[in-house]
Amino acid sequence: MRIVSGTHKGRLIHPTSNMAVRPTTDFAKESLFNILNNRIDFEETSVLDLFAGTGSITYEFASRGAKDITAIDINPRCCEFIRTTAATYGFLNITAVR
């Protein structure tokens, strides 16, 4: 998995094998964000990522400059992974909630 566009374009995301998730493919993310790019101003947007899993969509919004992002997942491993990855990439606008 990778971040498709924005300030962190091309950075890889390496989820641990103990997370029972199916991450959104790069192709699907690229298609989704091509549509959103023409409709919203990311810098003025607050995002709620439900069922965040690995945080793939969360990081994509952060890389594109979303104002603040809340990622929610029931799995504590997923939330911890999102927090760790956000800190690694310097995304200060991400909050992970279980």
Give a label for each model feature.
Residues 1-98:
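Class I S-adenosyl-L-methionine-dependent methyltransferase catalytic core
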